Amino acid sequence: IMDVSFIFVNYVNYMNVNRNYTDSLAQTVANTCRLVVDGDSVTGYLDNRRRNTAYYEVWNKLIDYRNTSENVLQISVVNFRDGGGCYVYDTDLTENGAFLGDIRPYDEAQNAIKDELIACEKIEPLEYNGRSDYYIPLNSSYNIPVAYIIVGISTENVRREQLTYLG
């Protein structure tokens, strides 16, 4: 019985370390994005829906930054409204990606916290199959939240390591 309880305690500690790593990675990515993405510019892009040279420079930096870690699946900047999320930047370059001004309806997890998303409140990560999405508010120069930086972190590598650990 003691061996089983030690294994369980070690496993719980291992899970906590992995969760802390994922949280830390997402926060580091978001903080770096805050250095690149100007909240006041986000408001301007949302209003006029026009891309300029500065827009593309930021977008390319976000794509480059996403590519620095295999665990960072996606970086987006999104403003939530009644109809869904209005995208400013999205680093998903597949057909599933969004462009400036695209509005995507709320998914099931987002719909459950729709009011918090519209208010740009701090929320817990949303869990999807194989990923955790972290929503970190982006503020204007007046310290008013204008959008979220959404960082999608892979949980597949952690799951593989867990299976190896348990195997």
Region locations from a protein language model:
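Short N-terminal helix-loop-first-beta-strand/juxtamembrane motif that initiates sensory/input modules
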Residues: 63-85
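Short hydrophobic beta-strand segments that form the core of ligand-binding sensory/regulatory domains
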Residues: 137, 148-150
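Extracytoplasmic/periplasmic sensor domains and loops in membrane signaling proteins
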Residues: 90-126
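Extracellular/periplasmic ligand-binding regions of membrane signal-transduction receptors
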Residues: 23-57, 92
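A short beta-strand signature within small-molecule sensing/ligand-binding domains used
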Residues: 118-120, 128-139
